Amino acid sequence: MNNKFFKLIFYLALLLSCTPSFGAKWKAKHVVFIGLDGWGAYSMEKANMPTVKQLMKDGSYTLEKRSVLPSSSAVNWASMFMGAGPELHGYTEWGSKTPELPSRVLSHYGIFPSIWGLFRDANPQAEIGFFCQWNGLEYLAEMKAMSKEMHVKAEDDPSGKADKAVATHSCAYIERKETSFRRHFL
């Protein structure tokens, strides 16, 4: 019995010595956050979107996210950015520019804390680009935390398409800057 026990311990120790360190943490060099407003996860299975599917395969994503109520753009984007529901951040309407309810907490940027301000505070030298098509997003993020922010319009691209303009300006920015956290919305 003792012989089997020692063999088990030996092989377990050998196995553990061959694995990477449990304490080692992988850190991404860059983070790109892409949000698509109004896109239902139910469409993914039949969608012919090889680029998006490749990004999903190589990155991190969820198809399980549910809308907060009321299900409108500003309320849901605020909830994703801020990691809290409307009862805490206070945004309750589609085009909210300021919270309809008083925010439970305010960051030093003057709005409920979000990933953008928290990331900037943790990484003061980081390059953070913020490009969006819908100008309503500008009220839901700490714009003073951004290195570059741009509300892109359809006329900003020769194609006349706003989503193409967001991609064009975002790519140009990424090529010019060594960005840490990028946010692009189509």
PLM regions and their residue ranges:
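Bacterial N-terminal signal peptides
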Residues: I9-S17
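Boundary at the C-terminal end of the N-terminal hydrophobic targeting segment
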Residues: S21-G23
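Catalytic-adjacent loop/helix segments of enzymes that bind and process anionic phosphate/sulfate esters
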Residues: H89, S107-F112, P124, G136-L186
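Loop/turn elements at helix/coil->beta-strand transitions in domains of secreted/extracellular proteins
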Residues: K27-V32, D58-T62, A122-G129, K177-R183
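Short beta-strand/turn micro-motifs composed of small residues
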Residues: C132
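Bacterial N-terminal signal peptides that target proteins for export
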Residues: M1-F10
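Active-site nucleophile/metal-coordination loop of metallo-enzymes that catalyze phosphate/sulfate
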Residues: K25-A28, G40-D121
